[in-house]
Amino acid sequence: MDKAVLETQFPDMNLVRKGKVRDIYDTGEAFLMVTTDRLSAFDVVLPNGIPGKGKVLTKISEFWFKQMAPLVGNHLISTDVADFPDVCQPYAKVLSGRTMLVKKAEPLPVECIVRGYISGSGWKSYQNNGTLCGITLPKGLVESDRLPEPLYTPSTKAEVGDHDINIDFAKTVDLIGRERAEKLRDLSIQIYLKGAQTALKKGIIIADTKFEFGLVDDEVILIDEVMTPDSSRFWPMDTYAPGGAQKSYDKQFVRDWLVSSGWDMKAPGPEIPQDVIAGTVAKYQEVLELITGQK
């Protein structure tokens, strides 16, 4: 197994942001978004990563950016290192396959979450009071049930180490104005529906996902990552059975191990065992092949 890329060190380049998974460099005209193999769970970056994960996320996002282009513009300029500025070329080996040259968008301060099925924190909330993010749901749903229609449940965008906080639609109006809030909601549901339909044909249920949007020349565009195993719950369609937790192609495998380990969900996180890493690598590779046809 290859070694995980946990850090990028390009001393003659301008690092402007280090996120949970991505390192962002300013090249002057554009940003260079390098997707590392770091793994975050429960809003904590874990000490060891998943080898090759950054390449999987980049390929899947590139696939979806192209699929969604008729619905919404995006920030992707190129994933080909040959197109990157000269200052990047000495680092071509590290950058190759895990990097996007992207437009300089101004991120909007909302995580746009769409839920097509009830699972995870949404299921816990429904068990407690019959609601999901303040939205009352029909009685009688079971864990992993498909919702009558996809729900838009936005949250704040937390800094590294902080937790995202669910907010209602009215709060997004306060944050970004009614017109943009409505646009983000409508686009999120449209993108989810198109992506979920595409994935279903390939044997994958996208149970829920999150999108991020930004502004370029005052136009709302899709940024960051799109419907990857890091930002979504992916379930195999052939084993789907409502009434309990589902097998998954995403980092739920790691989340389940973390819960069983007795970790208190506070930083620092525990070291992930090699068998859990190997299993996660296999799941990410499988979903890449199913969705994009690439290896």
Swiss-Prot record:
Q: Which Gene3D superfamilies match?
A: ATP-grasp fold, B domain (3.30.470.20), Phosphorylase Kinase, domain 1 (3.30.200.20)
| Keyword ATP-binding belongs to the record | yes
PROSITE patterns noted in UniProt: SAICAR_SYNTHETASE_1, SAICAR_SYNTHETASE_2
EC number, as in UniProt: 6.3.2.6
Q: Which residue windows are coiled coil? A: none
Name the source's superkingdom.
Answer: Bacteria
Keywords linked to the UniProt accession: ATP-binding, Ligase, Nucleotide-binding, Purine biosynthesis
Biochemical pathway: Purine metabolism; IMP biosynthesis via de novo pathway; 5-amino-1-(5-phospho-D-ribosyl)imidazole-4-carboxamide from 5-amino-1-(5-phospho-D-ribosyl)imidazole-4-carboxylate: step 1/2
The record lists the catalysed reaction(s) as: 5-amino-1-(5-phospho-D-ribosyl)imidazole-4-carboxylate + L-aspartate + ATP = (2S)-2-[5-amino-1-(5-phospho-beta-D-ribosyl)imidazole-4-carboxamido]succinate + ADP + phosphate + 2 H(+)
Task: State if ATP-binding is listed as a keyword.
Answer: yes
- Biological process annotations from GO: 'de novo' IMP biosynthetic process
Q: Which GO terms describe its molecular function?
A: ATP binding; phosphoribosylaminoimidazolesuccinocarboxamide synthase activity
Supply the enzyme class, top level: ligase
UniProt record similarity statement:
Belongs to the SAICAR synthetase family.
Q: Which NCBIfam families match?
A: PRK13961.1, purC
* HAMAP family, A to Z: SAICAR_synth (MF_00137)
Q: What is this protein called?
A: Phosphoribosylaminoimidazole-succinocarboxamide synthase
